[in-house]
């Protein structure tokens, strides 16, 4: 069996598992068969998020005709790691607003979280088609960074998550195409470095070494990046302005992004043993909903192929 099909088969098994009843606390099954349980949050953070969920539910009860109130309940569920509940809620909302790109974008994101990649592609591709008829608008930030305005938009999020869904299934050219569309929606440095990181990865894996080099050409040290510093530093690594030894991974989703970028870079520049070991370790990480961990799982499932034919440095 071709190794390129392994991640697809794993995703199909996971999708089937997503439709089946899960034990209490289990949100999904990882591509390697690991039971993925709701994360344990620090008590103060959990209490705050539960309070905000209760408030969002109350708002929805008062005005169920307001689509945005459905979205906020789904987002609040997601911040608590209750992804299957969020998916069910978005599905109910889509019965009221069929084909709504905002609802499809959020449900597609949560399908990604639970490893239902085919369902994610279906939702996000439908959202992308709907975006052709809908003006772009900035989305409010559910977990804002103090002093930083929201910067991602509907169109950005649709193409970003669609590209990631293709990437984790090994569909590199489709991922490149979606991230290029996403880059066209990016008008700030925070967004640009996030897209540039993934676009570089997809172009490298598709064998487009010249395209990968061109992707990071415009990245500079002095870009206005506060939130996505891991992506920024990784882009400088890809450009040759940093070495892996100079970069350190922190905690949380940002740390997972850095760990994936470092491991993936090691893999594609020829340090295969180091890259594979780091990706296997990341694939087993407790922070399983982060994109870095999802991408690492996918790399392990597809046995780390395909690889470029020569050193991209």
Task: Tell what function each PLM region has.
Residues 18-72, 79-80, 305-311:
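N-terminal leader/linker segments that initiate helical-solenoid repeat arrays
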Residues 64, 98, 132, 153, ...:
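Short coil turns that delineate tetratricopeptide repeat
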Residues 75, 109, 164, 201-203, ...:
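Residue-level recognition of tetratricopeptide repeat
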């Amino acid at each position: 069996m071709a190794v390129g099909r392994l991640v697809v088969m794993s995703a199909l098994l996971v999708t089937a598992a997503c439709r089946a009843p899960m034990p209490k606390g289990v949100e999904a099954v990882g591509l390697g068969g690991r039971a993925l349980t709701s994360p344990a949050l620090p008590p103060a953070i959990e209490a705050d998020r539960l309070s905000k969920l209760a408030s969002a539910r109350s708002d929805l009860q008062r005005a169920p005709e307001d689509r945005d109130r459905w979205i906020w309940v789904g987002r609040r569920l997601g911040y608590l790691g209750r992804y299957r509940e969020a998916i069910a809620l978005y599905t109910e909302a889509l019965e009221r607003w069929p084909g709504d790109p905002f609802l499809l974008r959020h449900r597609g994101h949560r399908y990604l979280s639970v490893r239902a990649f085919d369902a994610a592609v279906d939702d996000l591709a439908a959202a992308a088609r709907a975006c052709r008829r809908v003006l772009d608008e900035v989305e409010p930030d559910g977990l804002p960074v103090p002093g930083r305005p929201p910067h991602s938009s509907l169109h950005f999020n649709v193409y970003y998550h669609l590209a990631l869904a293709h990437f984790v299934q090994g569909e590199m050219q489709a991922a490149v195409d979606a991230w290029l569309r996403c880059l066209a929606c990016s008008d700030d440095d925070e967004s640009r470095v996030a897209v540039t990181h993934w676009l570089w990865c997809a172009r490298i894996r598709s064998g487009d070494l010249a395209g990968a080099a061109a992707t990071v050409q415009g990245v500079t040290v002095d870009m206005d990046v506060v939130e996505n510093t891991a992506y920024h530093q990784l882009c400088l690594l890809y450009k040759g302005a940093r070495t892996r030894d100079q970069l350190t991974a922190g905690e949380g989703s940002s740390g997972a992004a850095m760990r994936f970028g470092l491991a993936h870079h090691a893999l594609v520049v020829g340090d295969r043993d180091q890259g594979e070991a780091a990706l296997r370790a990341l694939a087993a990480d407790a922070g399983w909903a982060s994109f870095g961990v999802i991408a690492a799982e996918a790399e392990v499932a597809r046995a780390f192929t395909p690889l470029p034919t020569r050193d991209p440095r």
